[in-house]
């Protein structure tokens, strides 16, 4: 794919600067979700096993170029030591004499964590001088933070031009999964796009209709498309001012040979709350006081049938109000169908986005998907067809 991995590098005795995403939630000094740290473990273990000395570069929160104690990475040292099962040292800067001294003194089997890169205001400006200061700490640069790859920052883009560079295991897995999904996918390809607003996913929809065979639209977005087709949506969440744009997307999809799938029947309630009284109606029968909160059983059957004839699935966004029972039914059932097909070796399934990950976890389907991205903005920008600076830098370095 044009970029190098850890397998292409001689790591013996080398100081390996690893750009990581350890932007984890902390409450009262306690890490409440260590998923991002756990996902780094293969990279750190492989570097240590090959005789390399990992030096971690990371941002934490948005300090705006100021040193803020509550955003210091030093508080993560105990959590990292437990995860990596080795000694983790800490330097109170990511450049300068103290950081250079700590990097030079790092012993085999140890890990060095550098202070928050965003304590330097120039980090987010892709400052080459800051990148040069970081590069002095290592012999090799390894980017394992796909979640930050859509940002051209000193620690993600500029530094890759200054050292031999490669992708870490997490970055490698993410890029390989995404290449399978949209780069050179097995066809037919289906995309599921849900969520509240068409306006926030215009570029995404525009890119997908050129690349996929079926585009399943759910959530509040689907209501806007129903409005564009002249169908009633009552008091449902819908962007009525976007109906002309939605109509244009429908026309472009038809011209591109992409079949857009909208709900043929809907689950309607008068209140947006769990277990609200509801009814299943055809998509042309939503009453004035009704709110569409989920796709109906006929719609779900159609989605399952499309999954069965697909070879690749990309999923971003729920099909309904998944946070409210029973309006999570279509999302859960579709997710479990995709999981079963993946388990049977009949489907490559890739999903990403905050609500998507939450919905798939809630359904119990997440563990069977081929790949689930926790990268958020980077995953969306990749789906939109944009060039990610952090990835482009690795390709150029390769």
From Swiss-Prot:
Keywords: ATP-binding, Cytoplasm, Glycolysis, Kinase, Nucleotide-binding, Transferase. Its EC number is 2.7.2.3. It comes from the Bacteria. ATP binds at residues 201, 323, 353-356. Substrate binds at residues 21-23, 36, 59-62, 118, 151. It holds the Pfam family PGK. Pathway: Carbohydrate degradation; glycolysis; pyruvate from D-glyceraldehyde 3-phosphate: step 2/5. Its main location: cytoplasm. It catalyses: (2R)-3-phosphoglycerate + ATP = (2R)-3-phospho-glyceroyl phosphate + ADP. Disulfide bonds: none annotated. One of its GO terms (molecular function) is phosphoglycerate kinase activity. GO terms for cellular component: cytosol. PROSITE patterns: PGLYCERATE_KINASE. One of its GO terms (biological process) is gluconeogenesis. Belongs to the phosphoglycerate kinase family. HAMAP family: Phosphoglyc_kinase. PANTHER family: PHOSPHOGLYCERATE KINASE, PHOSPHOGLYCERATE KINASE 1, CHLOROPLASTIC-RELATED. Monomer. This is Phosphoglycerate kinase. It comes from Ruegeria pomeroyi (strain ATCC 700808 / DSM 15171 / DSS-3) (Silicibacter pomeroyi). The lineage of its organism: Bacteria, Pseudomonadati, Pseudomonadota, Alphaproteobacteria, Rhodobacterales.
